[in-house]
């Protein structure tokens, strides 16, 4: 444990000072407001509790919020006095919700600074990679590695029950005591109002207004767990390690780090000897992780027991064992990054000849396969109000006030992004149903705007109005390969294509990961 403590203390970049004064800077809230407008492909105007506001009025409210924070001397030093609340003491629900949302978003921008600085290369070293690193690059890795493994641990990363655990973990990254007190005060107040957490069984579902702050806290918790977990694993291997770090929703700070692990000959090898497995791979996105191994069932079961005890003794909360499932790759499919992935076994017969004798040899080959999860996608379309839970298209009332070109552009952009992101599916025909839902939802939205029916609208404007929904994937989304033909490539619906320009998961698939 002494080496573990030294490993934690050696990383001096984990701590930053003097973040608290930034809470009183107006430009912080401007950055948070701009991020909220431009972070989604749906791009819906930001509204608070059903009331709209423009940029000028929001700027005035931000200045008023900063003034109130300056005047509240008891904000940090009188934590026990909750009768006078800075954010919800106002009689108008609009102001209370606006203040709470802006403080949450502004503090999230501030807390991102230590994480961002860790990913900015120093002036002495030369950056080895550029910003862009496609999410699709993980799938060729899985295709190359997982087809040769035996077992997989499908892990739902447990969440701390008490919010104080998240604050204590963040304390490892930030030494600014006033900022931590401010965060503790803010979380405690929201927890009392039952407003910060939605009334669900999982802490991982936060209200829409405060989701960004939660992602900061959750990401710091996951980073801490992986920081210690990988240290223990690295102590028992003479292997070259390549690690890639990317802060959630901050892909522009992506940096690839390569280093050679120094193996220590000490008691760690005696403790971890039964975990040695040179064919183990770990992949995580948000709250879901995959730990795959070529070892035996006994070895993978030991890893499960170790993870449960690790969360219990290091983070001081109980991790339910049923959140970690052990499954053989031969008959198991798992959902990851918007795809349903599995390892298929393909039998084949090979004809051999020796002199005048012929004989057949039956062989089994394993192939990593990815398909589009149609039913979950329909569920996310239903949550986004494009269709019913059964998949029947409906109009989008919030977009009915836009111009016809804007409505068509938004629906078409969503459709193209889905085709782009799911280009790695081996069965692209399943996307036709999703395109049909979006196309008819667009038509009904236009009909709602013009107070007409879909049939009359198409007769008046022409069926070519929605022709871009039928545009083949190869004609629209290829920024790498030039468009050389007007006809789709033969058999392209069966070919898997991984693109190098996808820096974020599709929003519809993203809904599934956070639901």
From Swiss-Prot:
Keyword line: Chloroplast, mRNA processing, Plastid, RNA-binding, tRNA processing
Source taxon at top rank: Eukaryota
Pfam families named among the record's database cross-references: Intron_maturas2 (PF01348), MatK_N (PF01824)
Subcellular localization(s) per the UniProt record: Plastid, Chloroplast
GO biological process: mRNA processing; RNA splicing; tRNA processing
Single annotated GO MF: RNA binding
GO cellular component: chloroplast
Entry annotated with the keyword Membrane: no
Keyword Acetylation: no
InterPro entries (UniProt xref): Domain_X (IPR024937), Maturase_MatK (IPR002866), Maturase_MatK_N (IPR024942)
Functional description taken from the UniProt entry: Usually encoded in the trnK tRNA gene intron. Probably assists in splicing its own and other chloroplast group II introns.
Family classification: Belongs to the intron maturase 2 family. MatK subfamily.
Name of the protein in its database record: Maturase K
Organism: Trillium undulatum (Painted trillium)
Encoding gene per record: matK
